[in-house]
Amino acid sequence: MKLCVAFDVASYDECINLAKELKGLDLWVKIGLRSYLRDGVKLLEAIKKVDNFKIFLDLKLYDIPNTMADACEELAKLDVNMFNIHASAGKSAMCMIMERLNALSKRPLVLAVSALTSFDEQEFFSVYKQDIKQAVKDFSKISYESGLDGMVCSVYESLLIKENTSANFITLTPGIRPFKENSDDQKRVADIQCAKDNLSDFIVVGRPIYKAKEPRRICENILEHLK
């Protein structure tokens, strides 16, 4: 299981300072919509210069198939190791994306977002008209059949996805509160042991790290628990 640190901070300088603080640690960096809209490609390049961190670009692309495929080809030109799209875009979009990316000599990992961890069961049903478990099964099936590399999901759907697809189908799980910290705006959260039990491949941790007085010490503690 790998640690992915969410750099969801308020400025470019804070991102770079956090990267410097974590230099040398075996982890991935997640750059989300806020940071990418604010700082763009220069942030990705600057983080790579601090240390050759692997980068997960968390933009959750969602559009018509051709537009998504074009965008994903552009993303593949960036120095990122993984990005995500919404499974709700459907199988046609996912197949087109993977056909384009697989024609390249090198491509990033591509994950599909199932149900945002900010959803509880009631709110999810009001949008999708089915329960989370069934939707995740459906989304994971079409994502796997389309050739994607894995899913973004809550810890509580990780095992379900692997059982429905393959043990090698990646699950990346946000909403991790390593030592049972406050869940903030996340609804379906879990700790490290729960992530281990549910065979998560990546855990995403943000606020418990970047809001800490000693982010490096927190990361080292998490990495020790992942062994």
Curated annotation (Swiss-Prot):
GO molecular function: orotidine-5'-phosphate decarboxylase activity
Active site residues according to the UniProt entry: K60 (proton donor)
Catalytic reaction(s) noted: orotidine 5'-phosphate + H(+) = UMP + CO2
Assembly and binders: Homodimer.
UniProt entry keywords in alphabetical sequence: Decarboxylase, Lyase, Pyrimidine biosynthesis
Species lineage: Bacteria, Pseudomonadati, Campylobacterota, Epsilonproteobacteria, Campylobacterales
Organism annotation: Campylobacter lari (strain RM2100 / D67 / ATCC BAA-1060)
Stated name of the protein: Orotidine 5'-phosphate decarboxylase
Gene3D superfamilies: Aldolase class I
Protein family membership: Belongs to the OMP decarboxylase family. Type 1 subfamily.
Name of a matching Pfam family: OMPdecase
Gene Ontology biological process terms in this record: 'de novo' pyrimidine nucleobase biosynthetic process; 'de novo' UMP biosynthetic process
Binding site for substrate: 8, 30, 58-67, 117, 177, 186, 206-207
Pathway connected to this protein: Pyrimidine metabolism; UMP biosynthesis via de novo pathway; UMP from orotate: step 2/2
Function: Catalyzes the decarboxylation of orotidine 5'-monophosphate (OMP) to uridine 5'-monophosphate (UMP).
EC annotation from Swiss-Prot or TrEMBL: 4.1.1.23
UniProt signal peptide: none
Any one GO cellular component localisation term in the record: cytosol
SMART domains hit by this protein: OMPdecase
InterPro entries associated with the record: Aldolase_TIM, OMPdecase, OMPdecase_AS, OMPdecase_bac, OMPdeCOase_dom, RibuloseP-bd_barrel
